[in-house]
Amino acid sequence: MATWSNFNLQNSASPLMEQIIFFHDHTLIILIMITILVGYLMISLFFNSYINRFLLEGQMIELIWTILPTITLIFIALPSLRLLYLLDELNNPLITLKSIGHQWYWSYEYSDFQNIQFDSYMIPINEMKNNNFRLLDVDNRIILPMNNQIRILVTATDVIHSWTIPSLGVKVDANPGRLNQTNFFINRPGIFYGQCSEICGANHSFMPIVIESISIKNFINWINNYS
């Protein structure tokens, strides 16, 4: 989750989020180089006294300012396209989780198992314990096994919501009457927080999402105990 005084992205908990962070850093380096170059040129123009009153055209400079931006865009577009294809790729998921957005809570169904479904509400401030996070903790967490491919189906019953876990690099719109899907792979145990990322009404800020990542053995025990 996000921490105090942290200006970076959240620590990744999935290979997909790692790739998103790499792309962010790659793009940021290019933007910094462009900013420095443009700043240097502007300062040079302000403080030098050179002038060319007879310059009518400059084909070479026009060629340069056409080719350089094109090359820059290619360097940004190629890794971006690769990442977009990775986002849509489904690799034989072990578990399918269905997430349904409501005003203003989430409900979940484990489609591969019988009778495992529950609602997930934010814990009110007056019921919080000392180790809870304000506006982030819920009464029923999503339990998922780590090091396994997970598919999630997202929909809504009333208005548009958005199911988002930043540390996993996952953000899916929940549209009424439509199923959207994506997949993710959690590569470490832990508790990961997210929130609804689409303004959905008065209590939009009170729709947190919590995933608890555990080993496959503990996940099987949880399934057996829940059933």
Curated annotation (Swiss-Prot):
Topology in the lipid bilayer: Multi-pass membrane protein
Binding site for Cu cation A1: 161, 196, 200, 207
Location relative to the cell: Mitochondrion inner membrane
Protein keywords: Copper, Electron transport, Magnesium, Membrane, Metal-binding, Mitochondrion, Mitochondrion inner membrane, Respiratory chain, Translocase, Transmembrane, Transmembrane helix, Transport
Top-rank EC class of the record's enzyme: translocase
InterPro entries xref list: CcO_II, CcO_II-like_C, CcO_II_C, Copper_CuA, Cupredoxin, Cyt_c_oxidase_su2_TM_dom, Cyt_c_oxidase_su2_TM_sf
UniProt keyword annotation of NAD present: no
Cofactor comment text: Binds a dinuclear copper A center per subunit.
Binding positions (Mg(2+)): 198
EC number: 7.1.1.9
GO biological process, one term: ATP synthesis coupled electron transport
Keyword Transport appears in the UniProt entry: yes
GO molecular-function terms, A-Z: copper ion binding; cytochrome-c oxidase activity
Mitochondrial intermembrane side: 1-26, 82-227
Residues the record lists as binding Cu cation A2: 196, 198, 200, 204
Transmembrane segments: 27-51, 63-81
Reaction equation(s) it catalyzes: 4 Fe(II)-[cytochrome c] + O2 + 8 H(+)(in) = 4 Fe(III)-[cytochrome c] + 2 H2O + 4 H(+)(out)
Stretches in topological domain Mitochondrial matrix: 52-62
Cofactor: Cu cation
GO cellular component, as recorded: mitochondrial inner membrane
Its job: Component of the cytochrome c oxidase, the last enzyme in the mitochondrial electron transport chain which drives oxidative phosphorylation. The respiratory chain contains 3 multisubunit complexes succinate dehydrogenase (complex II, CII), ubiquinol-cytochrome c oxidoreductase (cytochrome b-c1 complex, complex III, CIII) and cytochrome c oxidase (complex IV, CIV), that cooperate to transfer electrons derived from NADH and succinate to molecular oxygen, creating an electrochemical gradient over the inner membrane that drives transmembrane transport and the ATP synthase.
Quaternary state and interactors: Component of the cytochrome c oxidase (complex IV, CIV), a multisubunit enzyme composed of a catalytic core of 3 subunits and several supernumerary subunits. The complex exists as a monomer or a dimer and forms supercomplexes (SCs) in the inner mitochondrial membrane with ubiquinol-cytochrome c oxidoreductase (cytochrome b-c1 complex, complex III, CIII).
PANTHER family associated with the record: CYTOCHROME C OXIDASE SUBUNIT 2, CYTOCHROME C OXIDASE, SUBUNIT II
Family from the record: Belongs to the cytochrome c oxidase subunit 2 family.
Name recorded for this polypeptide: Cytochrome c oxidase subunit 2
Native organism: Choristoneura occidentalis biennis (Two-year-cycle budworm moth)
